[in-house]
Every structure is written in structure tokens, then in C-alpha cells.
Amino acid sequence: MTRLGSQGKEFPMMNLNETAARHGFCVDRVRESEELHGKMVEMHHEKTGAQLVWVDNGEVNKTFCVAFKTLPEDSTGVFHILEHSVLCGSAKYPVREPFVELMKSSMATFLNAMTFPDKTIYPVSSRNEQDFLNLAEVYLDAVFAPRILQDPNIFYQEGWHIELD
């Protein structure tokens, strides 16, 4: 089965239904979304409880985002500091600023990280499939195996400030 994308190109549709499972993710719900112009599949990971939403709408711009609930207990800005610290290298990519390297070498159409009052997100987009997969791999390694775990100085360098009287 194929679907015509927004650019008139045909895209194969993944055959997922509510009994399907892939890579430890089980499908909870499949529905058509008028707002997103396609099929939306909601899934959860059996071991970790991670939630995943996949949208099949034939869009040529592929987008991936890792998001975490980060509910602050105070106004220190610790989650914003962590957002920056996470992007200071990882186990597979131990360079000082992989985010900067990606901006120079990737074909990304969007590359960022953002902290909101209740969540922190790490979104990437690319029209090139291999570039998209590379971006997703770098971001996943950054959030699940950040260098900050071995080097706490990363947190200190990202979290300092000067107050002038």
C-alpha cells in the first residue's frame, strides 16, 4: 500500500495495527488524523514505558524528537543547564560540541533542543533519510549516554553565571 505525499511522491505505508509490535514497542492506538493529514500510531515500550507517536503522512521532511518531563522543584534552571550539558558529547560521539559539528555537516532542516516549564525536548528534521537516521542516532546517544555522566565539569561550565551589582 502506498500514499501520495505532500510533494506528489509515493511513500510506502507501514502496516501497523493494534496487535503489532516492533523493537519492543506495542501499538496502543491507530487512528486517522485530519490535523496531521495521515495516520497516527501511538505506541509504548514494554520494558521502559517510553511513549512513541509515529505519524505517517507522506511528508518528505522527516522529524524525530526525544522529550522528557522535567518538572522543576525550584527556579535554578537546572533542566536548561542539563539541556545544554547533554549536547556536550556522548559515549559514541565524545567531541566537545557535537551539536555545532552537526550544524556544519548535516543536511538538517531543523536541529535544536528546548526547555519548557514542564519538559525538555530534542528535535531534529531532515529530508535526507540517511542524514535523518544519523541525526536520530547522535541525539539518542546524547540523551541516553551523555559525557556529563563521566565528566561533571561539563555541568559546571554550562551552569555558571556572574551577577553584577
Predicted features, each with a name:
Residues 38, 56-135, 141, 153:
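M16/MPP (pitrilysin/insulinase) zinc-metallopeptidase core fold and M16-derived inactive scaffolds
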Residues 3-12:
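Short, Lys/Arg-enriched N-terminal segments with co-localized hydrophobic residues
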Residues 145-165:
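Acidic/histidine-enriched alpha-helical segments
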Residues 29-37, 137-147, 157:
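Charged/polar interaction segments and conserved charged motifs
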Residues 14-59:
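N- or domain-start disorder-to-order transition segments that initiate the globular core
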Residues 12, 28-29, 62-69, 164-165:
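Short N-terminal helix-initiation segments at or just after the protein's N-terminus
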Residues 34, 47, 115, 159, ...:
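Solvent-exposed, flexible loop/coil residues
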